Curated annotation (Swiss-Prot):
Pfam families: zf-Tim10_DDP. Keywords: Disulfide bond, Membrane, Metal-binding, Mitochondrion, Mitochondrion inner membrane, Protein transport, Translocation, Transport, Zinc. GO terms for molecular function: metal ion binding; unfolded protein binding. Its main location: mitochondrion. This is Mitochondrial import inner membrane translocase subunit Tim10 B. Ubiquitous, with highest expression in heart, kidney, liver and skeletal muscle. A motif (Twin CX3C motif) lies at residues 28-52. Disulfide bonds join 28-52, 32-48.
Length: 103
């Protein structure tokens, strides 16, 4: 069971990576390659693509670092909120998208 969950997580990670990669490729190509009249990229297009991809990768790393720093605090806050809600008698812990009446 755990192995299947790991495989599913790996597939999700791969899918997410490919989505980011494809979006980055599309964005940089549209920005840096104005025409398809030549088979090869010229030096200016190559430099533009290198710069564009570098900026996007750097931005992605900074966002991921911020996410990694914030995540423990968010998890602790959610745990505290859940514990506080479950400590109050007669009050069911609210879950996003689920109404307390079960409907």
């Amino acid at each position: 069971m755990e192995r299947q969950q790991q495989q599913q997580q790996q597939l999700r990670n791969l899918r997410d990576f490919l989505l980011v990669y494809n979006r980055m490729t599309e964005l940089c190509f549209q920005r840096c390659v104005p025409s398809l009249h030549h088979r090869a990229l010229d030096a200016e297009e190559e430099a533009c693509l290198h710069s564009c991809a570098g900026k996007l990768i750097h931005s992605n790393h900074r966002l991921m670092a911020a996410y990694v720093q914030l995540m423990p605090a968010l998890v602790q806050r959610r745990i505290a909120d859940y514990e506080a809600a479950s400590a109050v008698p007669g009050v069911a812990a609210e879950q996003p998208g689920v109404s307390p009446s079960g409907s």
